[in-house]
């Protein structure tokens, strides 16, 4: 169930605790079954060249992406150019 602090647009089945705060989650446009936080951050979709059905939240701190074939030090900001991306932390973003 949604917390009282959730926005009116909250979908009750998608309301969970986010890393930042308890917040509403709503289905994102590129994959209706996936819910992402809407209170502490913006919603973005991974570029279609990366994977159109994958959506990721822009966290309270920057998120960058690395391809599975890259080492943890090889980072790149979206849009990614490969089929799969996953969020990681890294100090100096540089494309793989």
UniProtKB/Swiss-Prot annotation:
The keyword Repeat applies. Restricted to a narrow region of the hair fiber cuticle, lying approximately 20 cell layers above the apex of the dermal papilla of the hair root; not detected in any other tissues. One of its GO terms (molecular function) is identical protein binding. Residues 10-94 are annotated as: 14 X 5 AA approximate repeats. Keywords: Keratin, Repeat. Sequence repeats lie at residues 10-14, 15-19, 24-28, 30-34, 35-39, 45-49, 50-54, 55-59, 60-64, 70-74, 75-79, 80-84, 85-89, 90-94. Pfam families: Keratin_B2_2 (PF13885). GO terms for cellular component: cytosol; keratin filament. Disulfide bonds: none annotated. In the hair cortex, hair keratin intermediate filaments are embedded in an interfilamentous matrix, consisting of hair keratin-associated proteins (KRTAP), which are essential for the formation of a rigid and resistant hair shaft through their extensive disulfide bond cross-linking with abundant cysteine residues of hair keratins. The matrix proteins include the high-sulfur and high-glycine-tyrosine keratins. Interacts with hair keratins. Belongs to the KRTAP type 12 family. This is Keratin-associated protein 12-3. It comes from Homo sapiens (Human).
